């Protein structure tokens, strides 16, 4: 009725100058073009200062992309790309406009007509529903689409949720409801292993940080790298334990997700520098070469160690700030955004694997020619343990995460998941054991400190 009344009032008027993304209709009024809606919410208007804003079909549920199709908003419409069906191409789909008719439902076009007629009379339909649930649920605002015989999110958006109440906003009137999407079910055993393993790692990392800071005789380029890696791992694991499930408020959750993104990328960047330093140290066994390369790297390792993650986070936050925070305070797994983390990690793991096997090859060929001081290490078991542990300290074991897909099957997937969790949560323990407890100088310092402690009678 409000819409008809407005048309009657405008029937005798001439069409005014229409703003950008609007056109004249019936020579009497302006209306926003398909894919746009007026900022005021009105369908018809005379005011040339009115703004026609792009409708984000991907976020509002108006897009008609098929299941697993990639939805990407663009000015005045959207595109659907089926590249997302193939895991390896997710990141590619996020940076190019690969559009294909088969990716749409019923080959529909990538534009959406503004369905906000009810706003003409000043009505802004909203509804709320008390719903039980925890922080790890997702509330979806829907209405019943009789022609399709199912629920639809078209024209409805989620406004706010707390522990017991959900508020929605829709641009039309119908029979509304709130669907509760439960978070993916967690394996309770894996959860316990993660919490216990990370707690032990935090203790070992704290002791390692104290060792690298206080033991002056061992302070050099190597210990600087170990210290920065230990700091990043300590902060990342601590934030993971305390903040990964703090999904409310959403802004805080997004900040936590961004910090975790930065800290874990920084961890892997320092692992890369560790691998590079290990390779150069083994290749240049002479003291003079070792010293010169150490001084050279020390000048650049801090800008590289923290600069590269900062650049990646800045670009990710600019491109998709809404992709931080899901059922947990981490990155969204759809639309290829997760590759802003997995991409750099995959590259670093591959590079460190190359460094690791080159180091083994060099040591194998030069072991007999090492100087007398180094050759005094005759315990083969200790050397073997150090060599294997170094593979995990360099982060290569994180590569198991790339094989945690449905195609491997439930049994193999469980084995990979448990191996991944146990090994990587104990990375801090291995770092402390290899670089502190198995370091002869550190052991001598610890023994000297213990000897100074007065014994009680």
Swiss-Prot record:
Residues 213-223, 272-299, 358-384, 435-457 are cytoplasmic. Residues 16-191, 245-250, 321-336, 406-413 are extracellular. SUPFAM superfamilies: EGF/Laminin. Glycosylated. The record marks 173-174 as: Cleavage. GO terms for molecular function: calcium ion binding; G protein-coupled receptor activity. InterPro entries: EGF-like_Ca-bd_dom, EGF-like_dom, EGF-type_Asp/Asn_hydroxyl_site, EGF_Ca-bd_CS, GAIN_B, GAIN_dom_sf, GPCR_2-like_7TM, GPCR_2_EMR1-like_rcpt. The keyword Membrane applies. Glycans are attached at residues 26, 106, 162, 245. Residues 1-14 form the signal peptide. GO terms for biological process: adenylate cyclase-activating G protein-coupled receptor signaling pathway; cell surface receptor signaling pathway; G protein-coupled receptor signaling pathway. Residues 141-186 are annotated as: GPS. May mediate the cellular interaction between myeloid cells and B-cells. This is Putative adhesion G protein-coupled receptor E4P. It comes from Homo sapiens (Human). The lineage of its organism: Eukaryota, Metazoa, Chordata, Craniata, Vertebrata.
